[in-house]
Amino acid sequence: MRAGECGRKFVLCCSNMYRIVLVCRGVPPHVGAAGARDIFEEFRHRSWHENVKCVWDGSQLILQAENDFDSNGLALLDEFSDSISACIEVGFDGDIQILSVTSL
């Protein structure tokens, strides 16, 4: 061993990343586009999610994000629900579903 070496080997490991896609149906059409923009802005402050996109496709909100901890999408689903409640003032009976979780 050379000076400064402790005799241990360190293995660098990369965390798995997940791309999660969620959809919220039942959003009133007149608030969908503004809601998508507001939710996107809300997620800009959540640095634990990367490559966030939130769009209104004319009938539903679609949220996509990547992170290294949410292998089943439930954490993002919970945060999406909170953001919808905070960003869309009009009450509605919507439904959030996990469309996909992909390991990157």
Model-derived segments and spans:
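A short, terminal or domain-edge coil/loop segment
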Residues: P28, W48-N51, T102-L104
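Broad gene-expression machinery/nucleic-acid interaction feature
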Residues: M17-V21, I62, D93, I98
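A structural detector for beta-sheet-dominated domains
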Residues: V23-R25, D57, Q64-E66, L99-L104
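Charged interaction segments
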Residues: F69-L104
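Short amphipathic beta-strand starts and helix->beta connectors
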Residues: R2-G7, R44-N51
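Short, intrinsically disordered low-complexity segments
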Residues: W48-D82
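Short, extreme N-terminal segment that most often corresponds to the first beta-strand
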Residues: R2-G35
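Short amphipathic alpha-helix segments
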Residues: P29-W48
